[in-house]
Amino acid sequence: MSADDAPMTADKGKVQQDDASTAGMNYLESLPRRVVTLYLPLGVFVFVLLFPFYWMATTALKPNAELLSREGNPFWVAQPTLEHFRHLVFETPYPDWMWNTVLVSVVATFFSLAASVFAAYAIERLRFRGSKQTGLVIFLAYLVPPSILFIPLAAIIFKLGIFDTRWALILTYPTFLIPFCTWLLMGYFRTIPYELEECALIDGATRWQILVKIILPLAVPGLISAGIFAFTLSWNEFIYALTFVSSSEVKTVPVGVVTELVEGDVYHWGALMAGALLGSLPVAIMYSFFVEYYVSGMTGAVKE
């Protein structure tokens, strides 16, 4: 093929791509096709996603008599009440569990994100020998199941004398937060042009100044994405919180709800669902505010 034929081939490919895009838009102009192709799958997805929250809300608002009755509609509340929420807040250590969960999640996320920034920058931008292998090893560390790690971690916790304290969770959560956050930030740092650093080095900037004044401001979406991921994992973590904490006043929400609100074979479903609903609200609110940054950070991390 001659050099003159190359532009014609490129133009032809572009025309074919435009025709395919136009054909796709024309296909969606029909209302029945839009219903089958878009609205119906989206409706099913939204139903499956939101129905557990609806079930938690209705169960938390039902009085005990209605919960135990076989009559009536199980998907609707006939006589709504806030008794379960009152019992949860004023008659159980739930406020302490919530405070413990917030404190542990925020501190563990901060430490993990700080360590991940330095690790990702060193691996991705300093370009030392074996940097790619180091990044791969860090990511593989994330794949190790917590059910295997908690045994040696328990021995370390006992030797340090921090069993049944918040520090036991704050120091163990980064074992699974740092590997993934590092891998995520490595992908996002890779999208930042290296020429910016070269220009800064020529102007006399240090590596610390480059990281703080150039890399981090450009990587805000990636940092928010990694922070949301780390906070969510810390908030929902169960195995370590169940193993390293035994006192009721130090427990987190995921552990406290399922261990303190169940008495033998008696399940207090109203209080259980109220606790689960209140425990899921902070994460849901956080995602609603930062979802654009989360998507942008995840998109930038998987490039290249």
List each language-model region with its residue ranges.
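A structural signal for multi-pass alpha-helical bundles of membrane permease subunits
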Residues: L28-S30, R34, L38-E304
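Short, Lys/Arg-rich, polar N-terminal cytosolic tail immediately upstream
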Residues: S2-L31
